[in-house]
Structure formats: C-alpha cells, structure tokens
Amino acid sequence: MTKEERRLWYDFLRDYPIKFSRQKVLGKYIVDFYSAKAKIIIELDGSQHYDKEGIAKDSERTAYLEEYGLKVLRIPNNQVNQNFRGVCEYIENEVKQSLCMNNPSGKNQ
C-alpha cells in the first residue's frame, strides 16, 4: 500500500461503521478499497493515472466495475495529503447516498 492508502485505511476506513476491504480482487482487477454493502470502490490515484495511457486504463477499469453496479470513487493522492478531512467527508457522503439508493425504503437489510 502507498502511504496515502495506509493513511486512509488506518485513520478512517479500518474502523468505519460500514465494512471496507483493502486490496480486494474484483474480476480481473485489484481495487484499493471496497465496500460490498455500499457498493463502492475507492481508488487512490498517483501521478501515473494522469497521463494518456493511465487515463485510458482507468476509464476501461471504471467501466468494467460499473457494469456490476459498483460506484468508483477516484481520489488523487495529493488530496489525501492536502485535504484529508475533505476526502473523508466526500467518502462519507457517497456512502450515505449509496446506502439510501440501495435501500430506498429505509428498512434494514
């Protein structure tokens, strides 16, 4: 894991009320973090994700994962370093929204 992945895991996701797994194999990919309940994948992106080849690979990967009804959150590494609280709030909001969409009646599953 990168230092950004370690920080997000140990300082936020590891003890998050909704279970997240790290380095989870999903089909032909290994994702950084995955919540089956929220149907969310979190990918932390370093600089290699922003060149032409990286963008193309990420686009293909995201499309593949979205075919299974998963939402992919792509977060630049520098945001984890510079705005950790904002990253956590963003994830929190996306998880809440996803849980509401996956359980519109509000009943516990």
Question: Language-model segments: which ranges?
Answer:
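Nucleic-acid endo/exonuclease domains
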Residues: 1-109
